[in-house]
Amino acid sequence: MATFDFEKSLAVVIGIDQYCNGIAPLQTAVADSQAVASLLAHNYEYQVLSLLDEAAQLTGLQELIQHTLPSLVSANSRLLLYFAGHGIAQHGDNGPAGYLIPQDAMPGNVDSYLSMVSLHDALAALPCRHFLAIFDCCFAGAFRWSSTRKVTVVDDVIYRERYDRFRQNPAWQVITSSSYDQPAMDVLSLRDERGEVVDSQSQRHSPFAAALLQALQGDADSSPPA
């Protein structure tokens, strides 16, 4: 698979099933992350850094975005960030305030969460030419409010000319499994809202991850719908 002249293709894959402190476990986040990591490494020549369960505690995530990524990413790199786990959103002055829930988060204590604003700011400071974030968690769409810049929603159909511009020029893209305005969920009763399906190898995945994996294996739409 062509790498489009990138010096480095780096993927950070985060998946959390087993939460601490009474937060309900998830059933497929780790399996989803492992499957995504395998495809990115073998089919797309990515160097993959995986943080699963205990490796995805708050201090580990902060170390990742503040120190590890800046030391690994160059101007001609492409970076992909995949997160599967719990997410929440709260009302903020400028729109929903989104948070990713680390493995060791304390329910009700936002200081123990990873805010989407801090994540966005750390990622935006990286010099990589291409960046893609994929969030499979509740309220993932709140990430768009983390930026003070105008955010453009990509059309359902991307024609070849526009795709080539994305590929050749600096680009920042975000894909989410959920919108920002889902009904608020009590953080004290976080549940597995991601759902699950079973693939042809009897592996359980969230519906979003199953569709993503199918696309990464070459079954994504490649022409406008009829």
Where in this protein do the model-derived segments appear?
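Active-site-proximal C-terminal subdomain of hydrolase catalytic domains
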Residues: 15, 33, 52, 128-226
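Short beta-strand elements in bilobed, periplasmic/extracellular small-molecule ligand-binding domains
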Residues: 42-52
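Terminal peptide-recognition signature
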Residues: 15, 36, 81
